[in-house]
């Protein structure tokens, strides 16, 4: 199998380096293992339709990144575009109230167990940042518990120990800053614990509960290979939070509206006090929200907790949400995701068995990941230290050559969408079989680009 050519992407990346720091608009777009002739690298996209994506060199891929998860129906879904384009004609942003805010908030409240009240935002980072502020105001406490390996946005409150080097993730977890520029004072307000460990979180809460405003957790570790909670773990967090007057926050930026119409809280039957959403709620449009009980959400308002934003609740984004939720609330799209994802997970595991490769398929059909490991289960970030990340990186390259797009980062997930087809499944499994055989044989065909590109 010949390697794909990425001449135009290569040239654009070199050009971008002169005007965009690191050549990108988000650090996560820098690939470290797939660039032709130069490292790092970023793939440049020309278009996306349905379950497929095309780069600027004309290479077509079956897409399992889905923009890090927002695209739950398919790229450029005409049902969403029709509603959005109709709203375009009424104006893009008012920075005033409009009826669709009420309509969509009521729709979210009807679907999400914790959502008595809703506030709209523009990104998952905004949503989690404001949820933390609300929790601190409500409890009149300042410390926040987060879990090692979880990412809750790029704000300073929680950008600790999202993916610490494995040689530093030993012993008792520490709040390790993941960026330069984070004030040291915030480190003392972020208490980091290991996920899925009943005893450790109970000891922490009993020792420091009177300082803790919130426990924030993803119900499924969306930036940690789709690790799922142990049976009863989310209920344990719920009980601990209730017993100690702590606000339990579910970060559903990735799981929300994806793993069930009512999010992971509906799937697992555990209701938090607050929850944050983004990504799938708009099928790719930039929109987010945070929601929770009336008592807690009513801390927001003039002369109380500040929340605002010129673009928050703008009519165009909410038109996308309105249309997307109308489709998702029936459950039919989720049935397709569940069926497709289950079959794909099973087929990939069968290929690995045929190739004699120890591989774990981890997660749920709507979002999952493959891990090259001898472990039968993974329960926390530190378990990923026992996975062959280099082998996954090589597989990523070979799958690109075969027209299948997974994320370069083994901590990320495969995301399925309603538009993924039986043909996509067959092509993916065939590509995976060939790619895995090549990787096992030490054959990795790096993408190529002209030296002068």
What feature does the model see in each segment?
Residues 1-453:
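Conserved N-terminal phosphate-binding loop of PLP-dependent enzymes in the Aspartate aminotransferase
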């Amino acid at each position: 199998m010949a390697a794909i050519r990425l001449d135009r992407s290569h040239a654009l990346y070199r050009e971008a380096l002169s005007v965009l720091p690191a050549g990108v608009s988000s650090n996560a777009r820098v690939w470290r293992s797939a660039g032709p002739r130069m490292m790092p690298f970023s793939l440049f996209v020309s278009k996306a339709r349905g379950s497929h994506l095309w780069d600027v060199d004309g290479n077509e891929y079956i897409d399992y990144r889905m923009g890090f998860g927002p695209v739950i129906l398919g790229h450029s879904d005409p049902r969403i575009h029709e509603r959005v384009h109709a709203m375009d004609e009424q104006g893009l942003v008012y920075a005033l109230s409009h009826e669709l805010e009420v309509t969509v908030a009521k729709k979210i409240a009807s679907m999400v167990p914790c959502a008595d009240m809703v506030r709209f935002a523009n990104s998952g980072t905004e949503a989690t940042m404001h949820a933390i502020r609300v929790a601190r105001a409500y409890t009149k406490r300042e410390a926040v518990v987060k879990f090692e390996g979880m990412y809750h946005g790029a704000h300073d409150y929680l950008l600790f120990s999202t993916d610490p080097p494995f040689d530093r993730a030993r012993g008792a977890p520490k709040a390790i800053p993941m960026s330069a520029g984070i004030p040291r004072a915030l480190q003392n307000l972020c208490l980091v614990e290991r996920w899925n460990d009943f005893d450790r979180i109970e000891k922490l809460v009993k020792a420091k509960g009177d300082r803790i405003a919130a426990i924030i957790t993803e119900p499924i570790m969306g930036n940690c290979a789709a690790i799922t909670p142990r049976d009863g773990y989310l209920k344990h967090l719920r009980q601990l939070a209730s017993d100690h007057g702590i606000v339990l926050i579910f970060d559903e930026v990735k799981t929300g509206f994806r793993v069930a119409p009512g999010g992971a809280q509906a799937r697992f039957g555990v209701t938090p006090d607050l929850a944050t959403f983004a990504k799938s709620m708009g099928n790719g449009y930039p929109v987010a929200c945070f929601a929770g009980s009336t008592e807690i959400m009513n801390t927001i308002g003039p002369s109380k907790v500040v929340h605002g934003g010129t673009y928050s609740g703008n009519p165009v984004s909410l038109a996308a949400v309105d249309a997307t939720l109308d489709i998702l609330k029936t459950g039919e799209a989720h049935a397709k995701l569940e069926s497709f994802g289950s079959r794909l997970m099973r087929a990939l595991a069968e290929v690995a068995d045929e190739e004699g490769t120890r591989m774990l398929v981890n997660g749920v059909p709507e979002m999952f990941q493959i891990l090259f490991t001898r472990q039968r289960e993974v329960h926390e970030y530190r378990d990923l230290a026992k996975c062959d990340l280099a082998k996954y990186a090589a597989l990523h390259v070979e799958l690109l050559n075969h027209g299948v797009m997974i994320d370069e980062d083994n901590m990320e997930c495969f995301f399925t969408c309603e538009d993924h087809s039986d043909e996509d499944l067959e092509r993916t499994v065939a590509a995976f079989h060939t790619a895995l055989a090549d990787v096992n044989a030490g054959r990795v065909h790096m993408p190529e680009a002209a030296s002068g590109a």
